[in-house]
Amino acid sequence: MSDKSFDVVIYGATGFTGKLVVEYMQEKYGNDEGVSWAIAGRSKEKLIAVSEDLKVGSNVPHLLVDSNDTDSIASMVQQTKCVLTTVGPYQLYGANILQQCVIHGVDYVDLCGEPGWMHEMINEHAEQAKETGARIVFSCGFDSIPFDLGVYFLQKEVIARHGQPASNVRGRVRAMNGEFSGGTAASLGATMASLKEKPELFEILVNPFALSNGFTGPEQAQDSKPIYDEKLETWVAPFFMAPINTKNVHRSNALMDHLYGEDFCYNEMWIQGPGEEGKAAAEFVGSMNPLADAPAPGEGPSKESRDNGNYDVLFCADLADGSTLHAAVSGDMDPGYCSTSKMIAESAICLVKE
C-alpha cells in the first residue's frame, strides 16, 4: 500500500469524539513528517471549522464523504492505508465503510460495542478480508482495549512464570471517573431496536463466545448480579461494558489459537467495597441504568471534566495451585472520551507503522 496518499483518514472528524481524535492526532503527529493523515466528513464547512478550531495544518486535507454514498466511501478508502471511523451506531452507518475496506485491502478501526453487528460483519467479510489483507479491528476505545490487553499482558506473564496460562481470569474495575459516551447510549438504543426486528439477536448478545469464530467454550461465571468476591474480600456489581468486553477477550483468545486455553473463563465486574455498605452499593449499581443520563450523540463533557477523569482496572489470574497473580491497567483522563480518542488513534498508527 505504498502508493496511498495517507496513512490514516479520520472519518467522523466533525463529531464530538471525532474532534478529540483530530485534536490528539494534531498534538502528537501534527509536525511528524512520517505520518500523513486526513479528516473526512459530510460537511465541508464543518471540516474547515474543526481545522481552524484545533489549528490543524494545511497539510491535513479534507475529504467529503457520506456513509450512504458508496462511491465517495470507495474513493476515501482507496486513498489511505487505514480508515479510522467514529461514526456510529455502526449498525446504521458502518457497513459500507467496512465493506469497502475489505474489498480494497485497507485496514479499519472503530469504536464499535455492538456485538450483533460485529457478528454479522465477521460472518460476511472475514474470508474476503483474509484474501485482500484488510485488518478489521473493532472496539478500539475504552471498550475494549484496556480489558483485552490487560488479560493478554497478565496471561503472558502467567505463561512466562508457570509454563501455562490461567484457566480463569477476573476483571475488576477499581475506579472509573468520567461521563458515559452519548455514542455508547445511541449504540445500545439501536441494538435494542434491532432486537424487535431480529429476535435471534438475543442469542448473540448473551453468548460470551458470539465473536469467537464458531468456538464454544466452557460455561462462564455469572456477572449479571452482585456477588461477593471471596479472594478480594469485596462486593462487586455488574459492569455495563462486560457484555462486549468479554466477547472481545474470548475472540482474541480464539484468534491466537487459544493462547489462554480452550477451557478459559473470564468475567468482569465493578468493585464496590466490603461489608454492608459495599453490598448496598453493589445492589444499587446492579439496579440502575448507567446510560440513563448519557449525553446525546455529538455532545459530551467539558474539557475540565474530561481532563479530570481516570480509570483503574485490576485483573486477577487464578492459578492451579490456588494462588493468584494480579496486573492492573490504569489511565488518566475521561475513559469514554479523551482516553478513547487516544486509544483509537494509536490503534490506527500501530496498524500502519508497526
Question: Which functions belong to the PLM regions below?
Answer:
Residues 131, 156-354:
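C-terminal catalytic/substrate-binding lobe primarily of soluble NAD(P)-dependent oxidoreductases
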Residues 89, 100-118:
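ADP-ribose/adenylate-binding Rossmann-like module
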Residues 112-134:
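Rossmann-fold NAD(P)-binding glycine/threonine-rich loop
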Residues 64-82, 86-92:
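Conserved Rossmann-fold cofactor-binding substructure of NAD(P)-dependent oxidoreductases
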Residues 30-46:
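Conserved glycine-rich Rossmann-like NAD(P)H-binding loop of the short-chain dehydrogenase/reductase
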Residues 6-28:
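N-terminal Rossmann NAD(P)H-binding glycine-rich loop of SDR-like oxidoreductase domains
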Residues 50-58:
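Short, conserved SAM-binding/catalytic segment
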Residues 24-34, 256-258:
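A short, Lys/Arg-enriched amphipathic alpha-helix followed by its capping loop at the start of a domain
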